[in-house]
Amino acid sequence: MRQHSPTRRGLLFLLLAGVASGQNAPDVAKLATDTSKESQACIACHMKGATPLAVQQWSTSRHAQKGIGCFECHQADKGRPDAFEHFGESISVMVTPNSCGMCHGQEAQEFQASHHAQAGQILGSLDNVLGDDVEGPAAAAMGCAKCHGSVVKVLGQGKLDPGTWPNEGIGRINPDGSKGSCSVCHSRHTFSLSIARQPESCGYCHLGPDHPQAEIYDESKHGVTYRALIGQMNLNSASWVLGKDYSVAPTCDTCHMGATSKLAATHDVGARISWNLRPEVAIKQKDWEKKREEMKSVCANCHASDWVNNFYTQFDNAVDLGNEKFFKPAKEIMTKLQQAGKISPTPFDAPIKWTYFELWHHQGRRARMGASMNGPDYVQWHGFYEVAKIFYSEFLPEAEHLLPGVTSGVKESSYHQWMKGLSPEQRQKIREYYQKRYEQPPS
């Protein structure tokens, strides 16, 4: 523990006791005296009126218990673009992965190598054109960038461009050259382990029509069991090893990042993911076999090998079905339309481009992601049903209208033979089923 003069400790205690709420005041005061003199000055001032609750939140954190205060995280070299002088100290309002990495070196290194850290690299993508150009910069700043991250710009004297800050996007590009934001998961200023481990934290970004992992998890047996038995999850434990510290259910953290008896915890969230389900046509990841074996080893803590292997067979079959039946043919048709001069290279300037975008970007992803996480309704009604509906009733007719004959190859494929009609025997079988089940024939 650092040593401070009795006078400083006494004054600090009286100050904090006068401004903090009841039972919290002695704790804040005592914890503050265990920090550096720079952090003590921060705490004394901020408790008087500038963000007092941030100080109280900090007082409940492990940082506070270890004597890690404001200055240790917010200090910044004078040459750093976003640094400014504040009561004689060089600081930044931004705490970046480089800042956290001073103590959490391995975690910061793993994170910088992860897909999360690259989430801000969407310049030139369709998503970026849609957000910045079609919708508009203000929408992109409050929408896309809040998850993907902004390129934070410095106006000078430590002031940050309001068009790019505040921002906690997971792939934020920081003035110090680092990428990402640790606090998007490890919320300020409690830095709570339990918050970071809860699926709701991941659901800040992983939800909605194009990446509904949070909703899929809630539907799955994993999510149902987690919610029912959350009191047994031991979420705030410093050690969190599957089978040792908890066993009743997995969270997002468990499968993608968590420690097991055979695997160390990692901050590279893609280390166990074998498919990239995001693009128009899903593709296997680099080193996908190794990644899959690591994920299987997590599954094996609860499931027999046949169950795990058969699940992956079903999952692969669903992804392959989407690729071969819908997404590859649709992409080929879009290429032919552009080559024939029927559509321009400009995104979103024709109805069929919106149809195609939603086909793979919304419905297609939902089907694939539902399959990956055991969410049957997202595979079926929110997924392949919507894919089929748009493909057959919107996309193919729109393409055929623009370039007659462009869909003929698709219709001849064995995947689409149903379009030629059912046999009399098939129709009769359906009629008999509906008559027996509902006492009425199908329309």
Ranges and model annotations:
Residues 13-23:
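Hydrophobic h-region of N-terminal signal peptides that target proteins for export
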Residues 1-11:
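Bacterial N-terminal signal peptides that target proteins for export
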Residues 9-10, 14, 215:
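A residue-level detector for conformationally permissive "hinge/kink" positions
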Residues 22-443:
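Short sequence/structural segments immediately N-terminal
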